[in-house]
Structure formats: C-alpha cells, structure tokens
C-alpha cells in the first residue's frame, strides 16, 4: 500500500502493478481504519487468496469522521497533527470490501448490507480460494455475522450469527478446514 492505493510486486521480476487509483484525501484503499486497528487489532486492509489469483481489499471513506488536533511529542520536538478520530457516538468511516481477479484486474464490490454504520472485523479465505468470508459487527457491537461470498456464482450466504443484549466479543479464532465446509 502506497499513497492510499494498493500495489503488488512480482518477487522474481520486480514488476510492480498498481491495482487501485482512487486513493486520495479521505478515500483509502487496502488500509485498516483507526477503529479496526485500535479496537479489533486488524492491522491490514487486504487479504491474498491462498492460490494468489485474487485479492480482497477494503476501501474506506473517512470523510464523515471528525478531525481533531493532537500533539506528537518527540525527544527534540513537538508536532501538531490533524487526525480523523471517531469519538464515541460520532460518525465512523464508511467501509467497502472488494475482490479483484489479478489476471483480469476486474474487481467486484461485495454487498455488505444496507446498514453503513458497521465494523468489518475479519476477512478470511476458504482454503480452496473459491470463497472469501468476512465478519460484520454492528455499531453497538450486539450483533456479529459471519458471511461468505462465492467467487464463481457471486452468491452470498450467512454462515453464522451471534447476538447479545450486552455485546459480542471478537476473537481471532476463525479458522476454516481443508474441506471448505467447516
């Protein structure tokens, strides 16, 4: 990721390919937003398929998020930084998820549903690279849904939902077996 856009680089040839070209200002491709990093420990916004033929990636729009001014203190200086910071109860980023076929460079935006005030908690591929899964959590963190997007037939299914009157905890325990069913 460079300058808010997604690039790939072929290891043997060194050839670099730019996959997105609309990252600028509040639009960022393949990057984890502040809440994902701080609260969900998700530090990336892109995920290679196991067969390396596709890549899933996020696009975030930070324009709804309030800007704050904060200080960074260094040994020899202090810098003032403007940062978009989603305070409790204020607007979060808008998030989208795409899958790109690396041979054709065609991307498909996955329908994350009508509710836009969501968190994208986790993205994982099934072992055979035919399905990308993702967990969406609502803003009050009382509903977590594990969904699957099938690349070949473009269908989406809900694999599992968890609801609570208080909140649903996130974890890093999501793992799929080689049978691509469990």
Residue map of PLM features:
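Predominantly five- to eight-bladed beta-propeller fold
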Residues: 19-47, 54-110
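Beta-propeller and related beta-repeat scaffolds in trafficking/envelope systems
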Residues: 86-93, 115-116, 161-178
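Short loop/turn segments that connect beta-strands within beta-propeller blades
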Residues: 11-14, 22, 101-105, 150-154
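Short glycine-/Asp-/Thr-/Trp-enriched loop segments that recur within the blades
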Residues: 26-43, 115-120, 164-172
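Beta-strand C-termini and the immediately following turn/loop, strongest in propeller blades
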Residues: 1-5, 10, 44-47, 56-62, ...
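A conserved hydrophobic secondary-structure block that centers on an alpha-helix together
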Residues: 1-26, 118-122
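Aromatic (tryptophan-biased) beta-strands that constitute blades/sheets of beta-rich domains
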Residues: 15-20, 108-111, 155-160
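Long hydrophobic segments that form regular secondary structure
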Residues: 101-138
């Amino acid at each position: 990721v460079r300058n808010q856009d997604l690039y790939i680089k072929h290891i043997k040839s060194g050839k670099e390919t730019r996959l997105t070209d609309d990252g600028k200002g509040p639009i960022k491709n393949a990057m984890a937003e502040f809440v994902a990093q701080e609260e969900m420990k998700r530090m990336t916004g892109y995920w290679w398929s196991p067969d390396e033929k596709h890549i899933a990636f996020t696009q975030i729009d930070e324009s709804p998020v309030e800007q704050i001014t904060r200080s960074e203190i260094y040994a020899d200086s202090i810098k003032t930084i403007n940062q978009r910071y989603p305070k409790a109860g204020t607007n979060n980023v808008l998030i989208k998820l795409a899958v790109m076929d690396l041979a054709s460079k065609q991307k498909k935006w996955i329908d994350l549903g009508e509710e836009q005030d969501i968190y994208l908690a986790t993205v994982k591929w099934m072992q055979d690279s035919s399905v990308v899964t993702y967990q969406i959590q609502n803003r009050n963190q009382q509903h977590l849904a594990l969904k699957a997007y099938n690349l070949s037939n473009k269908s989406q299914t809900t694999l599992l939902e968890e609801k609570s009157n208080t909140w649903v905890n996130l974890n890093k325990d999501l793992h799929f077996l080689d049978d691509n069913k469990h």
